[in-house]
Amino acid sequence: MAYAYLFKYIIIGDTGVGKSCLLLQFTDKRFQPVHDLTIGVEFGARMITIDGKQIKLQIWDTAGQESFRSITRSYYRGAAGALLVYDITRRDTFNHLTTWLEDARQHSNSNMVIMLIGNKSDLESRREVKKEEGEAFAREHGLIFMETSAKTASNVEEAFINTAKEIYEKIQEGVFDINNEANGIKIGPQHAATNATLAGNQGGQQAGGGCC
């Protein structure tokens, strides 16, 4: 299917926070309770619609283990959006967010949109990190924030789509150079066709005006 833009995402965070499950829920609308550890990088894609335009999301799910960190770093470059995930039932995954964020900002495009996600909101009885703590961290670092559940699908759609909306707004504001694919954005055939139609219409109007 033709798309107007392609946005590249990267999902980062500690091992076991539910990165692969979030991706699977978003792309396939299913939950897999037992998931093999991601080795290196896995990939998923899905089409969404923003402002009447088809947007293709190309999503890279990275390994959380320290031994794969150098591989993860190479995927920061060329990403327009990042989902930084922690597990609300494991305080240590929240404590490691600063390290992940520093890594992301050091190796990525400065305009990359980062969504902070507190995953496993269905496990409220085992919560170790308050929602207010996630909100405060996001405010302090200029991130978007949501709590999600890959198991129940709560807020999963919204997390991926709201990140895309933020990227799209930055394109409209001229923040992203969409002609530079290193920014994680690719112009699709639908966008090119629309522009060609607009140019043709403008040309026709100008020619018509010259006859009067």
Swiss-Prot record:
Keywords: Cytoplasmic vesicle, Endoplasmic reticulum, ER-Golgi transport, Golgi apparatus, GTP-binding, Hydrolase, Lipoprotein, Magnesium, Membrane, Metal-binding, Nucleotide-binding, Prenylation, Protein transport, Transport. InterPro entries: P-loop_NTPase (IPR027417), Rab_GTPases_membrane_traffic (IPR050209), Small_GTP-bd (IPR005225), Small_GTPase (IPR001806). GO terms for molecular function: G protein activity; GTP binding; GTPase activity. It catalyses: GTP + H2O = GDP + phosphate + H(+). GO terms for cellular component: acrosomal vesicle; endoplasmic reticulum membrane; endoplasmic reticulum-Golgi intermediate compartment membrane; Golgi apparatus; Golgi membrane; melanosome. Pfam families: Ras. This is Ras-related protein Rab-2A. It comes from Gallus gallus.
